[in-house]
Amino acid sequence: MPKLAVVLLVLLILPLSYFDAGGQAVQGDWRGNRLARDLQRGGRDDESECIINTRDSPWGRCCRTRMCGSMCCPRNGCTCVYHWRRGHGCSCPG
């Protein structure tokens, strides 16, 4: 096969990896896929308790919202917030 034909074939196939089956661009970050699926299902905000895997840590609150993606805060009573230029984090009382 001539080199030009191989180059054209590669250029044709290469962009296909950037799109999923629905024709939408695939997110590049590791948390984007789950968040994108949740948003496509109706954008339900879901908060449930979870255990943080650090020593002497109390219960935390898992947060899956449009704003926070999927994360856990260090203790009860915390809420997920977005800090401008710092990304997602927790806002805890006290």
Curated annotation (Swiss-Prot):
Propeptide: 26-44
Gene Ontology MF, one: acetylcholine receptor inhibitor activity
Disulphide-bonded residues: 63-72, 68-80, 73-90, 78-92
PTM annotation (4-carboxyglutamate): residues: 47, 49
Tissue: Expressed by the venom duct.
GO cellular component terms listed in the entry, alphabetical order: extracellular region; host cell postsynaptic membrane
Keywords in alphabetical order: Acetylcholine receptor inhibiting toxin, Disulfide bond, Gamma-carboxyglutamic acid, Ion channel impairing toxin, Neurotoxin, Postsynaptic neurotoxin, Secreted, Signal, Toxin
Superkingdom, natural source: Eukaryota
Signal peptide per UniProt: 1-25
Localization of this protein: Secreted
Function: Alpha-conotoxins act on postsynaptic membranes, they bind to the nicotinic acetylcholine receptors (nAChR) and thus inhibit them. Through its two C-terminal domains, this homodimeric protein would bind to two nAChR allosteric sites, located outside the nAChR C-loop of the principal binding face and at the adjacent binding interface in a clockwise direction. This toxin specifically blocks mammalian neuronal nAChR of the alpha-7/CHRNA7, alpha-3-beta-2/CHRNA3-CHRNB2 and alpha-4-beta-2/CHRNA4-CHRNB2 subtypes.
Sequence similarity: Belongs to the conotoxin D superfamily.
Subunit note: Hetero-, homo- or pseudo-homodimer (identical sequence, different post-translational modifications).
Domain notes: The cysteine framework is XX (C-CC-C-CC-C-C-C-C).
Listed name of the protein: Alpha-conotoxin-like Vt20.1
Gene source species: Conus planorbis
